[in-house]
Amino acid sequence: MQEISPTFFQIISTDYLAQNYFVMIFAGWVIYFIDALFEGNFTFFLLIFAAICTPIGLMAFFWRYRLIVSTFENGIEIPGQVTEIHTLSTGKKRKDFIIHYQYHLNGQLFQYRNRVKQKSFAKALREGQQVILLAHEKTPHIAFIKEMYLEAL
């Protein structure tokens, strides 16, 4: 049986950290060129800022992306329970959710929270709801809600 893993677009449209790390790769350069367009010259400080943000964003995004993919590919399915849900307004009609859940792995209780973008699965979650999680035995303190990351775009 082949394990299903979320696509690149599913990850950046669901996971708050992955999306922000991905934006960080390009944001410095966008700011740098927009400033040059309006000011008429290039600002050395913004060049340094962009040159620093790009590799940091690349490394952080690659780490988060690999963490999610490897958890889906090599992790084990475990039951978990949603313990808290916090809603954060990020714009007129957009919301992010901070979802807290707990689960048992190898006889030990773990709690994890994950900030995710507004998706239909996240909106439908309720406190106390049972969910299927994926956790890797090497990093048992991190688990992801399976259905949320595999939800169609």
Locations of the language-model features?
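A membrane-cytosol interface segment of integral membrane proteins
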Residues: 116-153
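Structural detector for short beta-strands of small beta-barrel domains
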Residues: 73-89
